[in-house]
Amino acid sequence: MLEPFQILSICSFILSALHFMGWTIGHLNQIKRGVNLKIRIRNPNKETINREVSILRHSYQKEIQAKETIKEVLSDNMERLSDHIVIEGLSAEEIIKMGETVLEVEELH
């Protein structure tokens, strides 16, 4: 049986991870918006447009990879910690689903 302090520590860790994940996703979205706003092509030609599209595609792929990595890390940690977390009325699967829901909500913003 876990001590109340241990339970609080685990819950605190999960909340910190969720906060960090939300901040990171928000920060990546701001970078993406900033990149989109800074692109102004003067005298566009096919080469310039292709280069700018390539830069945007690369930035977007990096953002998606970062989100997937965060999701994997959180999911792994939630699965490990769910065996030790007891929230009255919630199963381990429901706790993991809560973490995934937070990720989905953050992705929408």
From Swiss-Prot:
GO terms for biological process: proton transmembrane transport. GO terms for molecular function: channel activity. Residues 59-83 form a coiled coil. The keyword Transport applies. Residues 1-4 are virion surface. It is found in: Virion membrane; Host cell membrane. Homotetramer. This is Matrix protein 2. The gene is M.
